[in-house]
UniProtKB/Swiss-Prot annotation:
Entry-linked SMART domains: MUTSac, MUTSd
Matching InterPro entries: DNA_mismatch_repair_MutS, DNA_mismatch_repair_MutS-lik_N, DNA_mismatch_repair_MutS/MSH, DNA_mismatch_repair_MutS_C, DNA_mismatch_repair_MutS_clamp, DNA_mismatch_repair_MutS_core, DNA_mismatch_repair_MutS_N, DNA_mismatch_repair_MutS_sf
PANTHER family: DNA MISMATCH REPAIR PROTEIN MSH1, MITOCHONDRIAL, DNA MISMATCH REPAIR PROTEIN MUTS FAMILY MEMBER
Any GO MF annotation of the entry: ATP-dependent DNA damage sensor activity
Originating species: Burkholderia mallei (strain ATCC 23344)
Pfam families for the chain: MutS_I (PF01624), MutS_II (PF05188), MutS_III (PF05192), MutS_IV (PF05190), MutS_V (PF00488)
Function of the molecule: This protein is involved in the repair of mismatches in DNA. It is possible that it carries out the mismatch recognition step. This protein has a weak ATPase activity.
This protein's name: DNA mismatch repair protein MutS
Example GO biological process: mismatch repair
GO cellular component, one term: cytosol
Length: 891
């Protein structure tokens, strides 16, 4: 019975196929193998898409949708793109999260019976990009596979991740608890996620394109063996991955998928890194966003810490910087080695110094990505010429590094890494033309002298005219026929023409080709041989060049690991040089590390804000076992958030390995950085602003340790005053008594300023401001003690709130304060303003306020006329005036 059903199904399929044209049968067969992928089907100079693919591509790529003929009674909808412009269309598709199968003609149209043979040669997906036209120079593209491990009760116990940068060959694994998945994906930012049907719901929304993969691809035993085969090892012990379970299953699925999209082995995936949470300073998603490491809160790329630090001369250095910022090591050893290298670069003599080194680095190609394309046999001619020129420049670059490496072990290691693979430069120099064409099909890629046959074919093609002149001269001399001519036409090819009166002088080796009324045309063995070569020389030269180029790619494969080593060394050297340039240009210093708990920053500055303003007020920050929590008060816009963020950024920069914007800085161990700064409704997740705020606070209270740095900004403001105050008080107490972490706690709740009376480890500081009438001048200086006013109405006035609203607010504030005093209720919010008299009606002009003497003095002076000593004296004078009111000054 089963056999009969199978036979009838096959017969039905054959009948259905017979209703289509042979070409459409071929297309539908290929499409059936890639049902969820747009198939780009090569037809001559175009890639065509059909049926639903055509409709989708027309909509996404703004293509013209046409309709030609019918197949099996169905109109054939078509959309196409020129083959030479396909990369730009693929780039657009990838941005939409789509994948495309590139189907090429592999048969010879001249010998094909029926449709030319075609097959899919590569599949372009969001996570498997390697072509330069599809990639951003300064960011990596990751393909990630996710495997959920379950315990005996069937409950998810861990999640295994494997992610691959196909352009470089870097493969990483990690195993983590299910509740850590969101933070891990936020850090990795994969472009494409592979998951089995039953685990797709585990992936948070908006994390990348999701591709369904058969569950059996995630088999742990098969994945472990596939990893061993890929890395050519008997065991994964050397990589620390033998004990992993779900991560190895994820790696197996990832390697199957990546190899299938490329249609070949992944020769450049030769190393493995297992990431452990304890290696890096923990940064949860909200911390990465709030500190604006690589993206602003508005979603732009600048101004961020990354945009400020990225003065790298190579794309490799820029990508490494992005990785370092998201992976600051907990151990200070790595950071200290980087600081030592930066110091050596800054102290180097001018002839081998920083500027000279960076000038040389600007000539370096993207060796990392070129190597990836080499391994996949997709490198283009200019990739190879760029690689050759880079390797040729390495000896001089190594000499510069060697001159300064004696003072920094890291530079010595990098100098050794910059040695090109033996024989690689020689091969590239001999084989590749000085300035090759962009594509092999254009010719002119292989250098002259590399292959005698190719040189001969080129000579024939290029020197055809000269050969004919030389032959004509020789034949005239040999035959004595003075008017003998050697010519060519498209019908008969090359020939020797002799007039009728001279035919008796024709040699025996002449063979008649054509008889005319007044002349005979002949061919000789030599001319026939030349004709065969000349007429096919260009075509044969291109074919020979293609074969030679493929041979060069194959010959370079053994050098892949050496090229990867060079790329890694160049990227790190470039990034350290960029750190040195930033330190020199922006007046940054090398931080110090200690095993003692504490953070000490002397005259610290916010690196990004400082670059955006003309003058930045530097501030100190001291946290230690006796001073674990700073209660920060002061007006809105006074600089509380900036001060908190700059402390976290300076600490992060120190552990990343950069110098820091401060006069001096000293750090004890830091394991995690948490931020609870600002919030908004999570509409997609169905969470209110207050719920988002409490969720972030809960994560901090549950996970912060004595080595964690916590930033809390106005916690509790999203609910009623009493609820908010109670929560803020309890959270601050818990951070002091249980977590005992470094904490910067900004608040407007007056009651919290009494916390140091209960906990000596807490201290009050405030951001200073000067009131002028109903206005305010922010001084942005951090001073000891709590603030005495919040200046909320003054800030509202600065924001442009209409004057009638401000006056009404002042009247109501006075009423509330009087009511509060009469009821003897505690003051809940910062801070009680001085008694306020009734404001005049809205149609009456306000009484003129007495200008504050500090502001008057500021308005009198011309900053351009001040000498350094005068400026210092003036600063002391303003400080004295600021502490006194107008009445004191008048006295």
């Amino acid at each position: 019975m089963a056999t009969q059903i199978d036979a009838s199904s096959e017969a039905a399929a054959a009948t259905a196929a017979a209703q289509h044209t042979p070409m459409m049968q071929q297309y539908l067969r290929i499409k059936s193998e890639h049902p969820d992928t747009l198939v780009f089907y090569r037809m001559g100079d175009f890639y065509e898409l059909f049926f639903e693919d055509a409709e989708k591509a027309a909509r996404l790529l703004d293509l013209t949708l046409t309709q030609r003929g019918a197949s099996a009674g169905t109109p054939i909808k078509m959309a196409g793109v020129p083959h030479h412009a396909v990369e730009q269309y693929l780039a657009k598709l990838v941005k939409f999260g789509e994948s495309a199968a590139i189907c090429e003609q592999i048969g010879d149209p001249a010998t094909s019976k029926g449709p030319v043979e075609r097959k899919v040669v590569r599949v372009v997906t969001p996570g498997t990009l390697t072509d330069a036209a599809l990639l951003s120079d300064k960011s990596d593209v990751f393909l990630l596979a996710l495997c959920v491990g379950h315990n005996k009760r069937g409950v998810a116990s861990n999640i295994g991740l494997a992610w691959l940068n196909l352009a470089s060959g870097a493969l990483r694994l990690a195993e983590l608890a299910p509740d850590q998945l969101g933070a891990a994906l936020e850090r990795i930012r994969p472009a494409e996620i592979l998951a089995a049907d039953g685990t797709i719901e585990s992936v948070p929304a908006g994390m990348g394109a999701i591709t369904r993969v058969p569950a059996w691809h995630f088999d742990i035993a098969s994945g472990t063996q596939r990893l061993c085969d890929q890395l050519e090892v008997a065991s994964l012990d050397g990589f620390g991955a033998q004990a992993l379970t779900s991560a190895n299953g994820a790696a197996g699925a990832l390697l199957i998928y990546a190899a299938a999209t490329q249609g070949q082995q992944l020769r450049h995936v030769r190393s493995l890194k297992v990431e452990n949470e304890s290696e890096y300073i923990g940064l949860d998603p909200s911390t990465r966003r709030n500190l604006e490491l690589t993206e602003t809160l508005r979603g732009t790329e600048s101004p961020t810490l990354y945009s400020l630090l990225d003065t790298c001369c190579t794309a490799m250095g820029s990508r490494l910087l992005r990785h370092w910022l998201h992976h600051p090591p907990r151990a200070s050893v790595a950071a200290q080695a980087r600081h030592q290298a930066i110091g050596a670069l800054l102290d180097a003599p001018p002839n081998a110094g920083l500027d000279s080194l960076r000038s040389a680095l600007r000539q370096i190609a993207d060796v990392e990505r070129i190597t990836g394309r080499l391994a996949l046999l997709s490198a283009r001619p200019r990739d190879l010429s760029s690689l050759r020129d880079t390797f040729a420049a390495l000896p001089a670059l190594r000499e510069r590094v060697a001159e300064i490496a004696s003072n920094a072990a890291a530079l010595g290691r990098l100098e050794a890494a910059l040695e090109p693979p033996p024989g690689c430069l020689d091969l590239l120099t001999r084989a590749i033309a000085a300035e090759p064409a962009a594509m092999v099909r254009d010719g002119g890629v292989i250098a002259r002298g590399y292959d005698a046959e190719l040189d001969e074919l080129r000579d024939i093609s290029e020197n055809c005219g000269q050969f004919l002149i030389d032959l004509e001269t020789r034949e005239r001399a040999r035959t004595g026929i003075s008017n003998l001519r050697v010519e060519y036409n498209k019908v008969h090819g090359f020939y020797i023409e002799v007039t009728r009166g001279q035919t008796d002088k024709v040699p025996d080796d002449y063979r008649r080709r054509q008889t005319l009324k007044n002349a005979e045309r002949y061919i000789t063995p030599e001319l026939k041989t030349f004709e065969d070569k000349a007429l096919s020389a260009q075509e044969r030269a291109l074919a020979r060049e293609r074969a030679l180029y493929d041979g060069v790619l194959q010959a370079l494969l053994p050098h892949i690991e050496g090229c990867q080593r060079v790329a890694s060394g160049l990227a790190e050297l470039d990034l350290l040089a960029a750190f040195a340039e930033r330190a020199r240009t922006l007046d940054w210093v090398a931080p110090e590390f200690t095993d003692e708990i504490g953070i000490e920053i002397d005259q610290g500055r916010h690196p990004v804000v400082e670059a955006q303003v003309e003058q930045f007020i530097a501030n100190d920050c001291a946290l230690n076992p006796e001073r674990k929590l700073l209660l920060i008060t002061g007006p809105n816009m006074g600089g509380k958030s900036t001060f908190m963020r700059q402390t976290a950024l300076i600490a992060l920069m120190a552990y990343v390995g950069s110098y820091v914007p401060a006069k001096a800085a000293r750090f004890g161990p830091i394991d995690r950085i948490f931020t609870r700064i600002g919030a908004a409704d999570d509409l997609a997740g169905g969470r209110s602003t207050f719920m988002v705020e409490m969720t972030e606070a809960a994560a901090i209270l549950n996970d912060a340790t004595p080595h964690s740095l916590v930033l809390m900004d106005e916690i509790g403001r999203g609910t009623s005053t009493f609820d908010g105050l109670a929560l803020a008080w309890a959270i601050a107490r818990h951070l002091l008594s249980h977590n005992r972490c470094y904490t910067l706690f900004a608040t407007h709740y007056f009651e919290l300023t009494q916390l140091p009376a209960e906990f000596p480890q807490a201290a009050n500081v405030h951001l200073s401001a000067v009131e002028h009438g109903h206005g305010i001048v922010f001084l942005h200086a951090v001073e000891e003690g709590p603030a005495n006013q919040s200046y909320g109405l003054q800030v509202a006035q600065l924001a442009g709130v209409p004057a009638p609203v401000i006056r009404a607010a002042r009247k109501h504030l006075a009423h509330l304060e009087q009511q509060s005093a009469a009821q003897a209720t505690p003051q809940l919010d910062l801070f009680a303003a001085p008694p306020v008299v009734d404001e005049p009606e809205c149609n009456e002009p306000p009484a003129a306020a007495t200008p504050h003497p500090a502001l008057e003095r500021l308005l009198e002076l011309d900053p351009d006329d001040l000498k350094p000593r005068d400026a210092l004296d003036l600063l002391y004078e303003l400080h004295t005036l600021a502490r006194s009111g107008p009445a004191d000054a008048q006295r």
